[in-house]
């Protein structure tokens, strides 16, 4: 199965091949060694763990019960707690390459850390956001066109923070099931759950791997049968044409991270990090205050912030300009 889904970080793989594997192939990819700096992952893991302990709760898992821990909005929270780590972590080249291959240049990253404790329960097999979260009765009301479009608007991913052997519960995948035409309607049914448990595949993960899969593939996180916790940062990467699951505080991301970008000279890395920091799409907006420009779309926030970085614009000036830009997009009744 490795040759169907595994790509090594130093392989030269085309955009078309990435897209084909996710759409018509196995439906999943593992990028071995996508993060070469394992000390970076350790530092980010420490930041996540401190935040989880500080919040003192065990956030719910949509598809599993028990004492597993969740850290919602791990993107904003890393910017708040360890902004010096943000660019290297969320600006990873493979994260950008696969996201752009599936969604194009306008995409939005959200992230939720999942810690599966020893003995932690597995998830039930499911499809993911958007329609994977809808009850069957509502999915049945959706036109077939929308069901097919749902999986094209999101990419699921995970940054692997520790070695995950099979007994620790790497993601269970029903390879090729992303093309089951009625999957969003049927995945909860007992016969489909039985099929999933009978036919799923698992591949061990290594610390530093990146995992991606089509959101409509039938999948589930496995149970942790070891004595060590499993820490993975789950990524939901959305097309700018769709609504992501989480709300992001973009001004806070700029406020915390931009000063650290000024110390970085790697333009490609900075450009990728900026994709994770600001709104990927200029709509919705208040067209009275923010009227269409000659090119209709106007200047994207990603373009604006990269120009500011190139000019070494001060953090205070950037934040003031950004606040004004955001305010122009909001309609307020008199």
Sequence positions of predicted segments:
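Acidic, His- and aromatic-enriched active-site or binding-groove loops in soluble protein domains
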Residues: 127-151
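A short hydrophobic beta-strand segment most commonly corresponding to one strand
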Residues: 175, 227-243
